[in-house]
Amino acid sequence: MVCAWQLWLSPRPKRSVIASGSHIYSNDDAALFEFLKEDDGRWVVRETHYINNPLVKNGLSGPPLHIHWKQAEYFKVEQGVIGIHKNGKQLRVTKDDGVIEVPAGTRHKFWSHPSNQEDLVFKVWAEPQGLDHSFDEKFIRNLIGYQRDCKMANMAPSVFQLMLICYDCATLATPPFWVPLWLLTSIQYVLAYWIGGHLLGYKPSYSEYYREPGDKKTM
């Protein structure tokens, strides 16, 4: 139970119930996230970034620089052009380039490339899958759901809540320059769990955003 003083220190939006949906939308409907299962059993997300949305046109519909320290991330473009920043190098990727791997521990981000003339559609997933506290459906649903609810409530997202969601799924925000992984993890652990979790009462996951398999009943 969140205390009144915690709400006063760090207000939070009313959470939308999206746990049972097969897809979700990001801020201002800039991007669609579809949760899929491939024939080989892999969990993937198909993202569609709509070219006519201002956030997409300005290259702002993707995430900031970050690291997944447990897993490699993979991208496969189906339509359009994606820009990928990978350890200081910028890639321009289309469906002809096949699957692009971003190894675990690599600073990276992605966006709709300026040369795009159509909606950007791509699949993204992480491996190995099935790890505890890793890049998975829970991570995306909580991260995107929380940011969208903040936008709808005209409220700035809490950096401590964002860090808690991310750290709990082995993901770290990172500056554009190299910083030792041990230092990033130490600082963000304190900000996420000590301040975000213990002091402010945030959780890494909410039942409105995500429910474990087998517990998908309507709320």
Swiss-Prot record:
Keywords: Oxidoreductase. The keyword Kinase does not apply. Belongs to the oxidoreductase OpS7 family. Its EC number is 1.-.-.-. The keyword Nucleotide-binding does not apply. Probable oxidoreductase; part of the gene cluster that mediates the biosynthesis of virensols and trichoxide, fungal natural products that contain or are derived from a salicylaldehyde core. The pathway begins with the synthesis of the reduced chain in virensol C by the highly reducing polyketide synthase virA via condensation of one acetate and 8 malonate units. VirA has interesting programming rules since the first 2 ketides are fully reduced, the 3 following ketides undergo beta-dehydration, and the last 3 ketides are only reduced to beta-hydroxys to yield the trihydroxy portion. One of its GO terms (molecular function) is oxidoreductase activity. Pathway: Secondary metabolite biosynthesis. Coiled coil: none annotated. Disulfide bonds: none annotated. It comes from Hypocrea virens (strain Gv29-8 / FGSC 10586). This is Probable oxidoreductase virH. It comes from the Eukaryota. It is an enzyme of class 1 (oxidoreductase).
